[in-house]
A protein has these predicted regions:
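Membrane-embedded and juxtamembrane structural elements of multi-pass membrane proteins
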Residues: 1-195
C-alpha cells in the first residue's frame, strides 16, 4: 500500500507540474493568430460542429501545434508554422487540432492520465494507454483528411511541420521510426514495417 501511495503521489505531482506548464504556455509568448487564419479556424470549426468559441494563438513557446483546455479551448500554433508552411498544409494541421477539440481529447487525455496514475503498476495499462494515444492521433488525422479532402496534403503537412521543428534531427526520426513517420505512411497508404 505504501509503494502504491508513493507511486500515486509521484505521478500526481508530475500531472500537476504538467498542468502548470500548460497554463504557462497559454499565457506567455502568445499573440492572436492572423485574422485570415482565425477565419479559417472558424470555418473548420463550423464544419466540425464545434459550438464553443476557439482561440487560435501564435506561440513562440511551442514547437508543435497544441490544444489546451476543454471548456475554453485554445489552439497554440508555432510561429514557425504560421510563417513557414503553405496554406493547404497549415489548414490540414489546423483541421487536425480542431478534430482533437471536436472529439474532446483534452478531457479524455486527463481521464486517461488519472487511470495511469491510479493503476501505474500494471504494464497493460501503459501498453493500452500508448495504443489509445496512437489511435487518437489516427482518428484526428482521418477527420482532418475528411475536411481537407487529400491525405497527401495532410502527410506533407506533417512532414513540413517536422522539418520546421527539427531540421537537424530529420534523419533521427526516420531511423528511429518515430510515430510521425507511421502517421505519414498511414495517410498515404504505405505499409509500415514492424521491426
Amino acid at each position: 500500500l505504501l509503494v502504491w501511495l508513493a507511486g500515486v503521489a509521484i505521478l500526481t505531482l508530475r500531472l500537476l507540474a504538467g498542468w502548470l506548464f500548460v497554463q504557462r504556455l497559454r499565457a506567455r509568448g502568445t499573440a492572436p493568430a492572423p485574422l485570415a487564419w482565425q477565419q479559417i479556424a472558424a470555418r473548420l470549426s463550423k464544419r466540425l460542429h464545434i459550438a464553443r468559441p476557439i482561440r487560435l494563438l501564435e506561440s513562440a513557446m511551442v514547437e508543435v501545434p497544441t490544444v489546451i483546455g476543454w471548456l475554453r479551448p485554445v489552439v497554440l500554433m508555432p510561429a514557425s508554422a504560421l510563417s513557414g508552411m503553405g496554406p493547404l498544409q497549415l489548414e490540414a494541421i489546423l483541421a487536425h487540432e480542431l478534430a482533437h477539440i471536436r472529439r474532446h481529447d483534452y478531457l479524455v487525455n486527463l481521464l486517461q492520465t488519472l487511470v495511469e496514475t491510479l493503476l501505474f503498476y500494471h504494464p497493460a495499462v501503459w501498453w493500452l494507454s500508448g495504443r489509445i494515444r496512437v489511435e487518437r492521433e489516427n482518428c484526428c488525422d482521418d477527420l482532418a483528411v475528411s475536411l481537407c479532402g487529400d491525405p497527401y496534403t495532410s502527410a506533407k503537412a506533417l512532414a513540413d511541420l517536422e522539418e520546421l521543428r527539427a531540421d537537424s534531427n530529420r534523419l533521427v526520426l526516420a531511423a528511429t521510426g518515430g510515430s510521425l513517420i507511421h502517421r505519414v505512411r498511414r495517410l498515404i497508404g504505405t505499409p509500415s514495417h514492424a521491426g
